[in-house]
């Protein structure tokens, strides 16, 4: 398999709260040449909340083609190749490891301090990590199945 084949998808994702089922396996798994920009995100509920693997994926992170910024995880980053390590992740802008998250109503909660992405008109300014701020539950209402 050629993990350097083109075209390469490169999504930009921001203000996510990802809570796993408490299992011991991986939560977010970046591999197979994946490129991504992930900002203002909370990841918890898995034995390995954030795993990176394959030379191409880890090299893109190390060289800044892919970015993980203002990402808080409940344990440490797992690196299969050792190219992009937990120390590199922890040193990146705004990242936090070994966090104990507190939730209201199952999934409400954020951590102050996030990347302002409002220069891109697609994003709304949200200077916090996570998706749903306590007391500002935008998920309630008629658009979501209750």
Show which residues each predicted segment covers.
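Extracellular beta-rich repeat passengers
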Residues: 1-146
């Amino acid at each position: 398999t050629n993990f350097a084949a083109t075209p390469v998808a490169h999504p930009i994702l921001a203000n996510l709260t990802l809570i796993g089922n408490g299992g011991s396996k991986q939560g977010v798994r970046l591999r197979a040449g994946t490129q991504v920009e992930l900002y203002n995100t909370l990841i918890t509920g898995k034995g390995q909340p954030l795993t990176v693997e394959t030379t191409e994926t880890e090299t893109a992170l190390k060289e800044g083609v892919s970015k993980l910024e203002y990402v808080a995880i409940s344990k440490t980053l797992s690196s299969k190749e050792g190219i992009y390590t937990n120390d590199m992740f922890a040193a990146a802008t705004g990242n936090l490891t070994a966090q104990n998250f507190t939730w209201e109503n199952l999934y409400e909660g954020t951590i102050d301090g996030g990347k302002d992405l409002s220069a891109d008109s697609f994003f709304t300014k949200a200077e916090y990590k996570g998706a749903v701020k306590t007391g500002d539950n935008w998920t309630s209402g008629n658009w979501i199945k209750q």
